Design a protein with these regions (language model features):
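Flavin (primarily FAD) cofactor-binding/catalytic cores of flavoenzymes
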Residues: 1-254
Length: 254
């Protein structure tokens, strides 16, 4: 991640830097959301409720939940903070490190042996520039269609230029033969939720696809009623036998 790269540069893993600038489009260097109930976004029950929502609501939720997958781990943030504190407050070294949130790099120009970066501040619309010998991009991945699909594209229904329309069972909507299907994973975050690019539900996704391919439930995907009722009308109560599994007694010995 960008945080790991910054920490490596700060520690001189590639040699001591005269100056380090960490530019981020986010308004702060936010922590990964690892709250207990945030983990519930990565469950089949949540996906079931998410997929039936209106498109604008789904986009809103994805924005709200972004830090559950894209945030910086608490350990990394604390390590960076301690490194900076020790360097500048304890050792009193020159402040040659800058953290620059709320900025986008709009232009990258060759400047002698290095580079000149032009930046725009999102909040006050100010414009800045800086020069650097080395520029490291930590901007993630760009969505792209597989190169094997061009001949099939006229038959595939698209949501937009780079997004397929994916059904609940991970089949693509298309006008090809009904007995044939194209399955897609990591291609439907807009309809299947923030967990779709993650490995946490790989076993469940794979089982659902195999059940669909086989035309029978080889894998039992039934689940007890969820503790969190994500949608209105979810009135199922926890089953007594399921509750009994969590009953326990405590013995205290002194």
């Amino acid at each position: 991640s960008g945080a790991d790269l910054f920490l490596n540069a700060l520690r001189g893993e590639w040699g001591e830097a005269a100056e380090i600038n960490w530019v981020s489009r986010r308004n702060n260097f936010n922590a990964l959301d690892e709250a207990a109930f945030a983990d519930e976004y990565f469950t089949p029950e949540y996906i079931s409720g998410f997929s039936g929502l209106k498109e604008d609501i789904r986009h809103q939720l994805l924005d709200e939940q972004k830090m559950t997958s894209d945030g910086i781990t608490a350990d990394s943030l604390l390590t960076i903070y301690r490194e900076l504190y020790h360097r500048f407050e304890v050792l009193r070294k020159p402040r040659n490190i800058r953290l620059l949130p709320s900025r986008s790099v709009t232009t990258l120009e060759s400047s002698g042996p290095g580079w000149k970066l032009l930046m725009e501040h999102h909040l006050d619309r100010g414009r800045e520039s800086l020069e650097s010998d080395v520029v490291i991009f930590a901007t993630g991945y760009r969505s792209a269609l597989p190169q094997i699909l061009p001949s099939l594209m006229p038959l595939i229904t698209m949501h937009d230029k780079n997004t397929f329309k994916v059904r609940d069972d991970f089949t693509l909507e298309w006008s090809g033969p009904k007995e044939n299907n194209i399955f897609a994973v990591n291609a439907s975050m807009q309809t299947h939720g923030i967990a779709e690019p993650q490995l946490s539900l790989m076993a469940w996704r794979s089982a659902r696809i195999l059940n669909r391919v086989l035309g029978r439930d080889l894998f039992d995907l039934s689940m007890p009623p969820a503790l969190i009722q994500w949608r209105s009308g979810s009135r199922k109560k926890p089953q007594p036998e399921a509750a009994a599994l969590t009953h326990y007694t405590t013995n205290i010995q002194e």
